[in-house]
Amino acid sequence: MTRDERIQRLIAASPTLANYRLQLIDKIVSAFAQPKDFRRSATSELITPGVLEDFGDVLRMHHCLSREPFSKDKFEYALERILIESGVVASLAPRGQRGFDIEISTEKFSLKTEAAKAIRENTIHISKFMELGGGTWGSNLEDLIGLRQQFLTALAGINRILILRTLKKSDPIFLYELVEIPKPQLLKASTGRLEMMMQSTQNPKPGYCYVEENEELLFSLYFDGGGERKLQVKGLQKSLCTVHATWQFELPTGTL
């Protein structure tokens, strides 16, 4: 369908729409006219100028209908559709697939989001990198070796890691950034310092893997022994990562 054909179809359909549907369309169109500042790294092969604009518009449309941050499932779907529209071969992983979330030009990507109220601009926290399934996990420090190996095995099945971070969500101004976490940095956990939190009342007991370099903490893995039994990545220095793009925008005030 050509651009003119699409415009004519919208014009023809407008008189048949109920008032609230017209309000929805009007708000979305109004959002696209608000101030915005979309930026991409000149070296990013993933976020082209077209992908930058299209993904930013999807974020703006989302916030016309919700105050909540863009969720992981929306991130996955939007990235796939926008890349395909731009001519890139992309496909979401089969439902239930562990490890990667999307394949882009033969590379397997893990997609994460971060949107905590206490988010820190210069350090990254992944509250659930993966679930920690079977294996021995009690109060023995050596149990953490097996849990760390689960993490390293998961990394072996992916090529790249992207995280969409919601840095500002103070309606009407929003700020998102897309950051790539270098896989080699995470692989440094293989020689990290392990510590079991023996004072914890949890069972199994939580533990840490501290990844340090020149007496500086680069990040830590947190083996969360709570109900979900999950692995967190804490305090990852953003300076070790690549910022592919940022999207800052305003939305029209008022309600639908």
Regions found by a protein language model. Give the residues of each.
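Nucleic-acid endonuclease domains
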Residues: 1-100, 104, 112-256
